[in-house]
Amino acid sequence: IIRAETIESMRILGVPKETIIYKDLPNVLLNDIPMHTVIKVVHDVIESVQPDVLYVPFMYDLHKDHREVLYAAQVAARTCTPTGRKIKEIYMYETLSETHWNVDHTEGGFLPNVFNNIEDYIEKKVEAVQAYKSQLKTYPDVRCVEAIRALALFRGSVMGMEHAEAFVLVRLLQ
């Protein structure tokens, strides 16, 4: 179901289906397989795609898979490797259903320092998120359209714009 929803969401955003990369890793069970396997999968994707910019989950997301993916990406993107040196920017993003459910006083809270203006894209973002029918809930659940709009509105208001997405800068090589 998730794969079909991803394809539909990416179609809405204008991402060609053939550019979507899937790997057969267990959902919600990444910590059940050896970390070196996850690192290799992430490294191979990075090496294949050769991105300049990498977006990764927030380090203290409650979802363990998010933490595993972040760790694997950090290892794969180390600047001591040719593959890692090609990545000039790394940003951690917030996930409504995971980032703010951690225990802020024992782990760091999400304190963004980069904001992208999405005033022209908020409706497209909402439409793309709505493609994930199996994941979307109704208000007041955090996985609802109203929460997505509210977060974009809040992040935008912090920077004096209508809507924004917020990130934590991890790396900026200039």
For every predicted segment, state its role.
Residues I1-K86, M92, Q135, A150-L151, ...:
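Active-site beta-strand->loop->alpha-helix modules in alpha/beta enzyme cores, enriched
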Residues E5-K17, K86-Q174:
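The feature marks non-catalytic terminal segments
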